[in-house]
UniProtKB/Swiss-Prot annotation:
Single annotated GO MF: pyridoxal phosphate binding
Cofactor: pyridoxal 5'-phosphate
Protein name as catalogued: Acetylornithine/succinyldiaminopimelate aminotransferase
Record's subunit section: Homodimer.
GO cellular component: cytoplasm
Species name: Escherichia coli O157:H7
InterPro entries: Ac/SucOrn_transaminase_bac (IPR017652), AcOrn/SuccOrn_fam (IPR004636), Aminotrans_3 (IPR005814), Aminotrans_3_PPA_site (IPR049704), Class-III_PLP-dep_AT (IPR050103), PyrdxlP-dep_Trfase (IPR015424), PyrdxlP-dep_Trfase_major (IPR015421), PyrdxlP-dep_Trfase_small (IPR015422)
Length: 406
């Protein structure tokens, strides 16, 4: 006897899913390029990008083809074996970056967990078992595991789960003097996002990152760049460290790496990687053929002059629209970020209302993000069309007008 199929609605979420999210009332069902449609057929311009994930838009033909081809070849074998798509992708990443070794995981959290474990272990086996201090920054975000959420340091994410990993120090972002005050030879790593995404789309200053590099060298500590959100072309360079001219010891990547397919990577040097051995870390799904095939196709498109050199012009188009909205409605105190990771900070009279602007945007037919309660965030496709930018920002202007009561 056939099981009766009931309608899938937003109410279904509340009935079956753990209450760790508060999703929108509409359910997207189809995407193409920078447009999305919901169950009722309503169209949205997507400037959220799945939180900086769909770097080539939705259902890009090259990614679809890679998925279909690999899906008919080999899905999963575990890391008891290696596979061709993983080795090809690893070679591409190494040839394009400072790195000499890479390991694949499934999410930004897992890549960062790997990085932090490696940093601690490297210090332990190469220097001292007492060299365990990790220095991180206020308003950081590095993931949701107990280790990564502790390095992130935001109490709203880390409190209420019992004892946390210890010897993690947090200091103000972009404050080199604060780092110097806590840095010593017991420090194993400094962990930093070149652009704080969840923390308000705040970019590090060149002097800050250069100073961190010098301090790490002075104290034999590793410099870890979390480029989960700002990497893979988002800034206009393949990775943000290239823009700054500051090379980390370890770099993490995820989100746009797979163009929408779950995959992450941790990149490092051969010498640092040699601290690990078989069994030091692992993942059942990490580096699976499906994910690596799609990521390889995404990499081949993103790492081209056509894409990377077009990002600044697209950014300026967004900024022009935001400035026009601000001139008309007087809502933003700052427009910041880098490349196509854009933050618009709300003026004091609208502090705490970022979600109101987000919801009004969805009602007007445009998907945007917030970065905390006071900042609107835009993380669109790196190949978003000018017409989509113009249409989406016009819709966002209508949303702003509604919130401010104009």
């Amino acid at each position: 006897m056939a099981i009766e199929q009931t309608a899938i609605t937003r109410a279904t979420f509340d009935e079956v899913i753990l209450p760790i999210y508060a999703p929108a009332e509409f359910i997207p069902v189809k995407g193409q390029g920078s447009r999305i449609w919901d169950q009722q057929g309503k169209e949205y311009v997507d400037f959220a990008g799945g939180i900086a994930v769909t770097a080539l838009g939705h259902c890009h033909p090259a990614l679809v083809n890679a998925l279909k081809t690999q899906g008919e070849t080999l899905w999963h074998i575990s890391n008891v074996f290696t596979n061709e798509p993983a080795l090809r992708l690893g070679r591409k990443l190494i040839e394009a970056t400072f790195a000499e070794r890479v390991v694949f995981m499934n999410s930004g959290t897992e890549a960062n967990e790997t990085a932090f474990k490696l940093a601690r272990h490297y210090a332990c086996v190469r220097h001292s078992p007492f060299k365990t201090k990790i220095i991180a920054f206020h308003n950081a975000f590095h993931g949701r595991s107990l280790f990564t959420v502790s390095v992130g340091g935001q109490p709203k994410y880390s409190d209420g789960f019992g004892p946390k990993p210890s010897d993690i120090i947090h200091v103000p972002f972009n404050d080199l003097h604060a780092v110097k005050a806590v840095m010593d030879d017991h420090t194993c790593a400094v962990v930093v996002e070149p652009i704080q995404g969840e923390g308000g789309v705040t970019a590090a200053t060149p002097e800050f990152l250069q100073g961190l590099r010098e301090l790490c060298d002075q104290h034999q500590a590793l410099l870890v760049f979390d480029e989960v959100q700002c990497g893979m072309g988002r800034t206009g360079d393949l990775f943000a460290y290239m823009h700054y001219g500051v090379t980390p010891d370890i770099l993490t990547s995820a989100k746009a790496l797979g163009g929408g397919f779950p995959i992450s990577a941790m990149l490092t040097t051969a010498e640092i990687a040699s601290a690990f051995h078989p069994g030091s870390h692992g993942s059942t799904y990490g580096g699976n053929p499906l994910a690596c095939a799609v990521a390889g196709a995404a990499f081949d498109i993103i790492n081209t002059p056509e894409v990377l050199e077009g990002i600044q012009a697209k950014r300026q188009r967004f900024v022009d629209h935001l400035q026009k909205i601000d001139q008309q409605y007087d809502v933003f105190s700052d427009i910041r970020g880098m490349g196509l990771l854009i933050g618009a900070e709300l003026k004091p009279q609208y502090k705490g209302q970022a979600r109101d602007f987000l919801y009004a945007g969805a009602e007007a037919g445009v998907m945007v993000l917030n970065a905390g309660p006071d900042v609107m965030r835009f993380a669109p496709s790196l190949v978003v069309e000018d017409a989509d930018i113009d249409e989406g920002m016009q819709r966002f202007a209508h949303a702003v007008a509604k919130v401010v009561g104009a």
